Amino acid sequence: MPKNKTHSGAKKRFRITGSGKVMREQANKRHLLEVKSSKRTRRLSVDQVVSPADVKKIKKLLGR
């Protein structure tokens, strides 16, 4: 049986911490930043924990 392949899109978007939490980056931090306040862009810089409803599916895509 062939090896399972990791989902390329998922491996670019998510990472798993040492304790097993799935982290993601915030949206809206790529372009048109001069319109957004410094406070907003700072807040968007912080990584977020993925919703528990999505964790199982994401871990499967990452081959975990």
UniProtKB/Swiss-Prot annotation:
Residues making up the signal peptide according to the UniProt record: none
GO cellular component, one term: cytosolic large ribosomal subunit
Keyword Glycoprotein: no
GO BP terms, alphabetized: translation
Ranges in a coiled coil: none
Protein family membership: Belongs to the bacterial ribosomal protein bL35 family.
UniProt-recorded name of the protein: Large ribosomal subunit protein bL35
Gene: rpmI
